[in-house]
């Protein structure tokens, strides 16, 4: 099993190209099931979850071609299987996103209940409730969601803001008969990206980027070409890496307007930030200052950046509180950071961080995707060698992270065994 060996190597300097967003690419790939035409996606990150989604779509009969760099062609005209099996779905929560488009187009779907990161119960009840409101008959049998029925437009008010639920219901509504009103929608950039692609495919959607979207069902959707939005979480992770080591790095193919709250927090921590339409520059010449964090739904501070800022705060000047309001059980990186010398205590959904001068390298275990990123960041500033184990979590969401960080001066190496 691969590991990362990391040693502090001073400030980071240079340029990094940000990949396309995993959280946008996966639903966009699933949208290929809505049409018999060809969906051409560009700026797709080559990640484990993308490969799993490719296998899932191919297992359903779709034709999926890739250049293995950043482009995919998905043709749903050959789909002949409406079942998404446990063997593939168990490793990735986003697999549930085939449910809405498959049901809407074929009138039936079977999807195994999903797996993915172990960061609390992220139920799919909002997905199912919305589909039932649109006329689906749904049963859960032997670990599978079994859905059937011709979907019709309806008013769907989600009880909680859910990114996956919004995406699943949005895709389903594009082929439903009549008008669907989706209320309490997630407004994350990745949701907006999906909606904009669906419009290119022929969907009629109003209210994109707001909490209420109205979808006029189309009889048919068509192929199109679409470029995946840049990954704001990957960009934020690299910015935290520079903030903890010092130095100056420019991120290319970035989308600063999608991550303004993260940039504001980095400025509060002492970084100098400059940005253009598609680039972000960070210059850090001092010890970071501790910053309070409270995760909330977009456009607030993203839960997917909480762990990275926890690592930054661990060596910051002063003390702070980090409050996690989105997921329970998302402080699993705290014991590992404390093993490296951090001074962090937790009480319920709040972590109290007292910054220390320096962390010490240690063997640590990744427990989920973003927790693994926080351990990499901590290792870049720790005295001695840090070994991050179980980095298969990292590979689910970061494309060549060791190569990208190495290109700007980080001492980081992937090793086997």
Swiss-Prot record:
CDD domains membership: UdpNAET
Localisation: Cytoplasm
EC number: 2.5.1.7
Residues binding phosphoenolpyruvate: 22-23
Keyword Cell division applies: yes
Top-rank lineage group of the source organism: Bacteria
Listed Pfam families: EPSP_synthase
Top-level EC class: transferase
Record GO cellular component, one term: cytoplasm
Record has ATP-binding as a keyword: no
UniProt record, GO biological process: cell division; cell wall organization; peptidoglycan biosynthetic process; regulation of cell shape; UDP-N-acetylgalactosamine biosynthetic process
Catalytic activity, as annotated: phosphoenolpyruvate + UDP-N-acetyl-alpha-D-glucosamine = UDP-N-acetyl-3-O-(1-carboxyvinyl)-alpha-D-glucosamine + phosphate
Family label: Belongs to the EPSP synthase family. MurA subfamily.
Annotated protein name in UniProt: UDP-N-acetylglucosamine 1-carboxyvinyltransferase
